[in-house]
Each structure stands twice: as structure tokens, then as C-alpha cells.
Amino acid sequence: MKRKHYGKYIVRWTVTLLLLVLIVAGAVWIPRLLHIFLTSTGRQPPDVPDTQDYPVQGADVSYYQGNIDWNVLESQGISFCFIKATEGIDHSDTQFRQNWSTAQDSGIYVGAYHFYRFENSGREQAENFMQQVPVTENTLPPVIDVELYDDSGILPDVQETRDNLQEMLDLLEEHYGVKPILYAAPNTYRKYISCFQ
């Protein structure tokens, strides 16, 4: 009698485990399959802007996306991409060199971006970026990604931030021979960047 009860226990746990595996696999693969289906049928996935309204489509990538298949991006209509290179004064993206190298062989225009850290000087951040990103013909201008990231509610000093950004902009423009692009959310733009117009 114990063996019969033990057999039911094994069956229940096996079925439960299989259901759990199917739920996890579904959570991972359903969004990917939906994206593939929508793209292959000519429809836009929900998080992609309509090509009628925005005919030029781009992307940004970092270590977070892993290895990039540039042919797939190109087949999805991506015509330009910014690759994360650096952050602050001493961080470089672990995938940058590989992404930069392999992207050069694709038909996608590429550029590099730097994640700005408010607590670091503009000069040191520019130096970090310039050490990692080579001066290369036919690449997009460098980008400085300026985002508020501290949840403490204490905002960085406006004038100090503007001074540091100006120093970084000047150094990057001098080094690469082109004006850098500033990327920011609307609130950050209004508070820290609108003065650069």
C-alpha cells in the first residue's frame, strides 16, 4: 500500500515540475515568438515605433544584450546603432570591443555612447571615452547619455553639471572632430541641458 501512495506522490511532483518548466519556458519564449511572428508578417511589435512615422530606425546596445547579430538587426530595418562604450571615469562596457569590431562589417551606421556619471568630472569622463573609442571614419558622433539615476531625491548641482558637461563636450569635439550628441529624458534635458542650444 505504501508503494501505491509513493507512486502517486512521484507522479504529482513530476507533473508539477513539468508544468513549472512549461510556465517558465513560455514566459521566456512567448514574447520572442510573438516578436518574430509580428516582424515576419509585416506588423510592428508593440515596443517598436511605426516605420511610417519614423522611417529611420535605430537601436542602442550594451553588454546587457549579449552577442549582437548585426545581420538580424539590419533585416529588422535598423539603419543605425549606438554602442555603449564607457561609464563614468573607469568603466568600459565588457562587450564594447566585440560589438564595435563586428558592427563595422555590417551595413548599419554605428557610433559609441558614454553613460554620464554626475559625481565625476567631465575631463576624466572624456578621457575614459577617448581611451576606449577609436577615431574612425564613417561613424556617428559620440553620444553622452545623461540620466538621473540616484533615487535619494538629491539632485546634482545644475551649474556644476553644466560645467562638467561643457568640458566633456569640448574635449570630445576636439578629439573626434564632430559635435557630440546629448541624450536625455525630458526632465533631465530641461534642468541640465537646455542651455546648450
Located regions from the model:
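Short hydrophobic alpha-helical membrane-anchoring segments
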Residues: V21-I36, E173
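Ser/Thr/Pro/Gly-rich low-complexity linker/stalk segments immediately outside membranes or between
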Residues: R32-Y54
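Substrate-binding cleft of extracellular glycoside hydrolase catalytic domains
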Residues: R43, T51-E74, I83-L169, E173-H175
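N-terminal Sec-pathway targeting helices
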Residues: M1-A27
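Residue-level detector of anion-binding/catalytic polar loops
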Residues: S79, Y109, K179
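Aromatic-lined carbohydrate-recognition surfaces of secreted/lumenal glycan-active proteins
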Residues: E173-R190
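Substrate-binding cleft/loops of secretory-pathway carbohydrate-active enzymes
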Residues: R190-Q197
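A general secondary-structure junction signal
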Residues: L17, V146, A184-P186
